[in-house]
A protein has these predicted regions:
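Short Gly/Pro-enriched loop/turn and capping motifs at secondary-structure junctions
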Residues: 209-210, 233-238, 263-265
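Alpha/beta enzyme core
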Residues: 41-74, 81-104, 108-228, 239-255, ...
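C-terminal helical cap(s) of enzyme catalytic domains, especially alpha/beta-barrels
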Residues: 250, 264-298
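Structured C-terminal cap/extension of enzyme domains
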Residues: 1-6, 255, 280, 286
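N-terminal amphipathic alpha-helix/helix-capping segment at the start of soluble metabolic enzymes
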Residues: 1-43, 87-91, 215-216, 294
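Short acidic/histidine-rich active-site segments
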Residues: 256-266
Length: 298
């Protein structure tokens, strides 16, 4: 059983619920695999329809079919999608993404406000009886609108903790002031902001310099109480993906990964097999070669 740090803004009456949710997300390992499904807003239809993308992916339900048959910690997506499809996928572990913006809003100075508040998510969880394990929110560090998003994120973390809900913050350097959003030193700084906000987990993009020094700067910024997840990014070579995740988690000490396109831009059978191979690396400590054999077997 993994030892859980319970933040002091969790009420005594909600601590066991928070602990159960953390254990469900991490499968009692302290590590986390998020299946990211917020891109239908973030990337519009770019990720879901094209010559190299299976037609399966054009249907929003494809994400739910994958999530329902894969060993993920949680499926992160918008509440509206969960409300539409959740009755058919009631066993899926969900993380509600509270804000999203389309990629038509460029990086000059992005702003993404919350669509719902935590109280509404808690009410939805109670009424729907779905397995809502947490909430998520993106902060664009460096944007002119940073102050507004940081304030909103702080309120979300506090309110979520009051409900016993863990919080995953997407911490992305963006804006005219940012010269290189993939700079490891800058990403580590964004982690600092997320930790100060009280996030339980922080999702960041990979640095452009993938040396151990760069990764360690980012991961160390999370300290001992905040888990760092690296995004998978655009679809990549299978061996590279598995090797990268293993290295990030089991050599450098990251908490896990959040993958979207690398999973859902496959047929249903292939997507489920790939998700379970990633889970074997993150949760079971399987080597990339063993995970690849598992994938090919399925």
């Amino acid at each position: 059983m993994n030892k859980i740090n319970i933040p002091l803004d969790i009420p005594l009456a909600k601590r066991s619920l928070y602990e159960r949710r953390i254990n469900a997300l991490t499968k009692n390992t302290g590590r986390l695999f998020i299946f990211a499904g917020d891109q239908r807003v973030e990337h519009l239809n770019d990720d879901f329809f094209g010559p190299e993308i299976p037609l399966d992916d054009a249907d929003p339900e494809h994400l739910f079919r994958i999530a329902s048959s894969s060993r993920i910690g949680a499926f992160a997506t918008q509440l509206g999608l969960i409300a539409k499809y959740g009755s058919s996928y009631s066993k899926v572990p969900y993380l509600v993404k509270l804000n999203s913006k389309s990629n038509l809003v460029k990086d000059e100075d992005p702003y993404s406000a919350a669509w719902y508040d935590v109280r509404q998510v808690a009410q939805f969880a109670k009424n729907s009886k779905l397995n809502i394990l947490g909430v998520g929110y993106t902060v664009y560090v460096g944007s002119t609108f940073e102050t507004a998003m940081v304030h909103e994120a702080a309120q979300i973390v506090y309110q979520a903790h009051q409900e016993g809900l863990p919080v995953l913050l997407w911490m992305y350097p963006r804006g005219k002031a940012i010269q290189n959003k993939a700079d490891a030193h800058l990403i580590a700084g964004a982690v600092n902001v997320g930790v100060a906000l009280g996030a339980d987990f922080i999702k960041v993009n990979k640095p452009d310099d993938v040396s151990p020094h760069s990764y360690l700067e980012i991961i160390k910024a999370g300290g001992n109480c905040t888990g760092i997840l690296f995004a998978g990014g655009a679809a990549s070579n299978l061996d590279d993906l598995l090797n990268t995740i293993y290295t990030q988690v089991h050599r450098f000490g990251a908490t896990g990964a959040a993958l979207g396109r690398n999973i859902h831009q496959h047929s249903l059978k292939e997507a489920i097999a790939l998700a379970n191979a990633v889970a074997a690396i993150i949760y079971d400590g399987q080597a990339p070669e063993a995970a690849r054999r598992l994938l090919l077997k399925n």
